[in-house]
Every structure is written in structure tokens, then in C-alpha cells.
Amino acid sequence: GKFSVFSKILRSIAKVFKGVGKVRKQFKTASDLDKNQ
């Protein structure tokens, strides 16, 4: 019913946040490497 739709939306949002977190982590390590060189 409604709850399954809601949980699906929450899950997709969580996936997006996880992806953004990964990208930001990679971005941060890349910029740190640039600073060290």
C-alpha cells in the first residue's frame, strides 16, 4: 500500500545520499593529494 511506496522513496533517497557521500569522499582525497604535491 502507501507504506511500501513511502519506503521505496526513502530507500532511493538513501541511495542518492550514499552516492553523494562517496563522490564527496573521493573529491576530498583528490584535493588533498593535489595539496600534498
Curated annotation (Swiss-Prot):
Keyword check for rRNA processing: no
Superkingdom: Eukaryota
Protein name, UniProt field: M-oxotoxin-Ot2d
Source organism: Oxyopes takobius (Lynx spider)
UniProt-listed InterPro entries: Antimicrobial_3
GO biological process per UniProt: defense response to bacterium; symbiont-mediated hemolysis of host erythrocyte
Family under the similarity heading: Belongs to the cationic peptide 02 (oxyopinin-2) family.
Pfam family, one: Antimicrobial_3
Summary of the function given for this chain in its UniProt record: Disrupts biological membranes, particularly those rich in phosphocholine. Has antimicrobial activity against Gram-negative bacterium E.coli, Gram-positive bacteria B.subtilis and S.aureus, and hemolytic activity against sheep, pig and guinea pig red blood cells. Has insecticidal activity against S.frugiperda ovarian cells by opening non-selective ion channels. Enhances the insecticidal activity of spider venom neurotoxic peptides.
Record GO terms (molecular function): toxin activity
Keywords on record: Antibiotic, Antimicrobial, Cytolysis, Hemolysis, Secreted, Toxin
Gene Ontology annotations for the cellular component aspect, listed alphabetically: extracellular region
Tissue: Expressed by the venom gland.
Entry's localization field: Secreted
Residues spanning the signal sequence: none
